[in-house]
């Protein structure tokens, strides 16, 4: 099933010159969303993760649905100050500044096999920081899954070459 028709292009959002790829129509379509879960579920069958890690915020939608579907746990990676208790964090650079991501310090104890998911792979800065955070927390990253990849922005090259990456929709 071609999912591309379920992605809405929003020009000049969130700022002029940006073409935002909105997954909202995909989320509203049960057949389309079911296909996303089937394809990402195939990654779970192949890589046998113990946990799904999802990146704030749309990665939570993808990750919790996939984890529920596959009957495995979900771990959120969040912006700073959103998780209670002890956390591990990583600072990373953005195009115009920096940001920070955090994970519960005990979330990946015992070196679980982890599949990282998000809605979008663009420049790869957030994904790369999440990979480093997973490793710092003790997880064994076995793969990455994205609904959309903006290939021209080079995000895939920011990820470890030995980690399989699957994107369901690739825009060049």
UniProtKB/Swiss-Prot annotation:
It catalyses: AMP + diphosphate = 5-phospho-alpha-D-ribose 1-diphosphate + adenine. NCBIfam families: apt, PRK02304.1-3, PRK02304.1-5. One of its GO terms (cellular component) is cytoplasm. Pathway: Purine metabolism; AMP biosynthesis via salvage pathway; AMP from adenine: step 1/1. HAMAP family: Aden_phosphoribosyltr. Catalyzes a salvage reaction resulting in the formation of AMP, that is energically less costly than de novo synthesis. This is Adenine phosphoribosyltransferase. It is an enzyme of class 2 (transferase). InterPro entries: Ade_phspho_trans (IPR005764), PRibTrfase_dom (IPR000836), PRTase-like (IPR029057), UPRTase/APRTase (IPR050054). One of its GO terms (biological process) is purine ribonucleoside salvage. Keywords: Cytoplasm, Glycosyltransferase, Purine salvage, Transferase. It comes from Prochlorococcus marinus (strain MIT 9303). Belongs to the purine/pyrimidine phosphoribosyltransferase family. Its EC number is 2.4.2.7. Homodimer. GO terms for molecular function: adenine binding; adenine phosphoribosyltransferase activity; AMP binding. The gene is apt. It is found in: Cytoplasm.
């Amino acid at each position: 099933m071609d999912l591309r028709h379920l992605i809405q292009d929003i020009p000049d959002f969130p700022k002029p010159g940006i073409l935002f790829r909105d997954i909202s129509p995909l989320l509203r379509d049960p057949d389309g969303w079911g296909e996303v879960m089937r394809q990402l579920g195939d990654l779970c069958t192949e890589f046998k993760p113990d946990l799904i890690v999802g990146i704030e915020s749309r990665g939570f939608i993808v990750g919790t649905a996939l984890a529920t579907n596959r009957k495995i746990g979900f771990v959120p990676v969040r912006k700073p100050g959103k998780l209670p208790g002890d956390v591990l964090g990583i600072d990373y650079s953005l195009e115009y500044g920096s940001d920070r991501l955090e994970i519960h310090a005990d979330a990946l104890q015992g070196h679980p096999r982890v599949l990282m998911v998000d809605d979008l792979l663009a420049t790869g800065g957030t994904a790369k920081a999440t990979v480093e955070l997973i490793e710092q927390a003790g997880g064994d990253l076995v793969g990455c899954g994205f609904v959309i990849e903006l290939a021209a922005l080079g995000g895939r090259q920011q990820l470890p070459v030995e980690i399989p990456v699957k994107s369901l929709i690739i825009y060049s």
